[in-house]
Structures are given as C-alpha cells and as structure tokens.
Amino acid sequence: MAPLGYLLVLCSLKQALGSYPIWWSLAVGPQYSSLSTQPILCASIPGLVPKQLRFCRNYVEIMPSVAEGVKAGIQECQHQFRGRRWNCTTVSNSLAIFGPVLDKATRESAFVHAIASAGVAFAVTRSCAEGSAAICGCSSRLQGSPGEGWKWGGCSEDIEFGGMVSREFADARENRPDARSAMNRHNNEAGRQAIASHMHLKCKCHGLSGSCEVKTCWWSQPDFRTIGDFLKDKYDSASEMVVEKHRESRGWVETLRPRYTYFKVPTERDLVYYEASPNFCEPNPETGSFGTRDRTCNVSSHGIDGCDLLCCGRGHNARTERRREKCHCVFHWCCYVSCQECTRVYDVHTCK
C-alpha cells in the first residue's frame, strides 16, 4: 500500500475519474471483506455505468466471483511486477485504486486492464464449474470426438460464459468513440483470449489398481499464474500505436494503428498502448510514481530487479538482518511435524 504522505498529495489532485474503472475498488473495499456474509449491493458499487448496474442486478449471484477475479488480477499484477520500478502499488482509501498511473495509455495500463479482465473471466468460469451459481455450470460444448482409450467426462469449464461475463461487465464503460476506449477494449479482450488459448484437457484414469483402462477427460483452465506469465510477456512485447481521427455518421471517431509498419500488426492476443511510461524512479503524484527509494533490490542481478537499474543509478544501502525461522523439521509417524528454531543472517540491500 502507498504511504500516507503520498495519499495526502493524491487527495489534492483533480483526477478525471469519468473514464477510470473505479468499480475495481469492489475488490479492495469494505464490500469485498464481507462477501461471505452479506449479499452484493449493486447500487453501492462505485463507478458503475447503467449497463453494469443492470448486469449486476440480473446476475447478482456471480458478482462475488467478479470481485474475486479483480482481486486475483491485482495480486497477479503485484507478483509479476514485484521486481520492477513500478510494482503495481495500490492506493488505499481511494476509488482510483492504482492512482493516476492508469490515466495514461501506457504499457502498465494495458497490462492492468488485461489481467483484471482475465481475472474476472477466470474466477467466474471456475465458480460456475464448482456449482456456486445456479445460472451457470459446466460446458456442454465439447470440442472434437474422444480419442482412443478416453471419453468426455467430469466438468468442462465454460470459458465462453466466463468470457461473456467479463466482456459484458468490464467492457460496458468502454463504448466511447475515443482512442482510450479502443485501447481498453482491445486489452480487455487480450486478457480473455489469454485464458481461451490456454484451455487444455485434464484426464482421470479409471480401472482396477490404477490400470487406466479408460480415461475421462474435460476442458480445464490453466493456473492463473500461467495467465499472468503469458500477459507479462505480452507487456514486454506490447505494440505501440498511434491515434487517428476520422469522421463517421456519428461524428469524429478515434482509432488505433501500429506506429511502426515494419512490425507485425497486433493480434487480439497482443497488448497495445500509445503513450510512453514514466521512468518511475522518483515520486511524482501527477504520474502516480512512488519512486524506488527504500525498495529492496537484488545486488547480484543485472536485470531490472538489480540494484543498478531498480535504484536508477542512485546507489543502495546494505544491512544485515537476523531472522528466526523454523529449521531441521522432522515428520513423526503418525502424524505431526516437529521443528527446531534457527537464527539466520541475511544481507538486505535497499535503494538510496
């Protein structure tokens, strides 16, 4: 979470929240902590456009999964960027949970939209397969004929339904004829396509003594970490676009085209952006940068998590920490584990 002093500065900013996906705050606000005990109150979710409000009321039983999906997306973002200058910091007590970072059409904005959209599709799909909602369940659209020695069985996860929920809800506010809406729609879809392209068969053996005389198989989503890794690669290779304006019957419309014609045209699985990112080295409330001072760095790494790059050339401090940890653990039959407690010394390096 961001430091309090920085929050006070943020509060003084006049943020343009009209296009900000502030409904994401459902995943970190007080409603999230009470999901297991209280129903979702659609009217109390901040930032919903009328289409989202109608969707929430019609599908209220899957809204906890929507919140869980956004939460999973935020956590995966923080994992993927844990060693980078921008580490997906969230801002407490703010409807704009990422601060002004998402105001710009940068790579970071592209990734956050993609991983949040993917999170919603993933969580809804998994919840349906687990039988948590009466309006959805297992997929009845089994692709292909069974192979030799196996048959369809189990519960194939219905990514088409999960993707529909993500598309109808997450894309509902992205209907403006401007470049930013076009970018957000594209990256939201890239997140959903990341899951669809990683669906795979899972099988279970049946037979005496595990002989696997026959297998039953079903379609399953990958681990969400796989989706995070995939989208992080797409972040690193994101396509830079330029904005073009042209007149249509409804007025001026902004569209995106690749800045460099000698690169391949981005597919629906690629991320796109059209504004440069700040360097995130120093605190800057206008860009949402918290800087990298006091961040832990890896002194032995030459990558972005290394002290040279993460600390932006300012140097780093070194100290030792003594930590008490469990060690020499032994399993006893039956059934408990006993451990000793050891003191270990660690070298810690932090940015100046």
UniProtKB/Swiss-Prot annotation:
Gene Ontology terms: cellular component: cell surface; endoplasmic reticulum lumen; extracellular region; extracellular space; glutamatergic synapse; synapse; Wnt signalosome; Wnt-Frizzled-LRP5/6 complex
Entry annotated with the keyword Secreted: yes
Subcellular location(s) per record: Secreted, Extracellular space, Extracellular matrix; Secreted
Signal peptide (residue range): 1-18
A Pfam family: wnt
Post-translational modification: Proteolytic processing by TIKI1 and TIKI2 promotes oxidation and formation of large disulfide-bond oligomers, leading to inactivation of WNT3A.
Major location (coarse): secreted
Top-level division of the source organism's lineage: Eukaryota
Site feature: Cleavage: 26-27
Disulphides: 77-88, 128-136, 138-155, 203-217, 205-212, 281-312, 297-307, 311-351, 327-342, 329-339, 334-335
Function: Ligand for members of the frizzled family of seven transmembrane receptors. Functions in the canonical Wnt signaling pathway that results in activation of transcription factors of the TCF/LEF family. Required for normal embryonic mesoderm development and formation of caudal somites. Required for normal morphogenesis of the developing neural tube. Mediates self-renewal of the stem cells at the bottom on intestinal crypts (in vitro).
Family: Belongs to the Wnt family.
Subunit structure: Forms a soluble 1:1 complex with AFM; this prevents oligomerization and is required for prolonged biological activity. The complex with AFM may represent the physiological form in body fluids. Homooligomer; disulfide-linked, leading to inactivation. Interacts with APCDD1 and WLS. Component of the Wnt-Fzd-LRP5-LRP6 signaling complex that contains a WNT protein, a FZD protein and LRP5 or LRP6. Interacts directly in the complex with LRP6. Interacts with PORCN. Interacts with glypican GPC3. Interacts with PKD1 (via extracellular domain). Interacts with FZD5.
Anything else known: Gene targeting that leads to the production of a truncated mRNA causes full embryonic lethality at 10.5 to 12.5 dpc.
Protein name: Protein Wnt-3a
Organism: Mus musculus (Mouse)
